């Protein structure tokens, strides 16, 4: 199911993803995709670069960006993927839950975090998109307000789904 609670596991535009493995491993398991280091290849052509946690900051350093010049504390993304064709860094945060708890409040921080990533990447003229990949727990009615908020501040969410087409990545045949 995609954001807003509509649609379904549309394998023509994306892939079902349950967050049980990191994004690089997941992508490498898909038809015509390989991952070499941080490089994502589709049919042997580099289409993206994928980062997890501290690897994101290693990448920034290779680009001449000192994170401390822009933000006061590192944010460690679950997954970040820079898609070359649309010059966009997608921050993908996987959130799973099986009881009410701290993840509830974390969903409300996407606006702040997206702005922090924008500060880090503005010198590279990259766009930033912040996307939650949520499990079915968050389909409960008590999350309607927070899900509406996520959309209202320019962030996105999907349920158990990586929207390859939305990211600008080729969809496996």
Regions found by a protein language model. Give the residues of each.
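Nuclease catalytic cores
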Residues: 1-32, 40
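Short phosphate-binding/catalytic loops that engage adenosine nucleotides
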Residues: 32-33, 155
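Active-site metal-binding core of divalent-cation-utilizing nuclease and nuclease-like domains
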Residues: 33-85
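Short glycine/proline-rich turn/loop motifs
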Residues: 59-62, 93, 171-173
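Conserved catalytic cores of phosphodiester-cleaving nucleases, focusing on short active-site segments
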Residues: 79-97
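Short, charged, amphipathic alpha-helix that recurs within catalytic cores of restriction-modification
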Residues: 103-122
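Domain-level recognition of nuclease-like catalytic cores that cleave nucleotide substrates
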Residues: 122-173
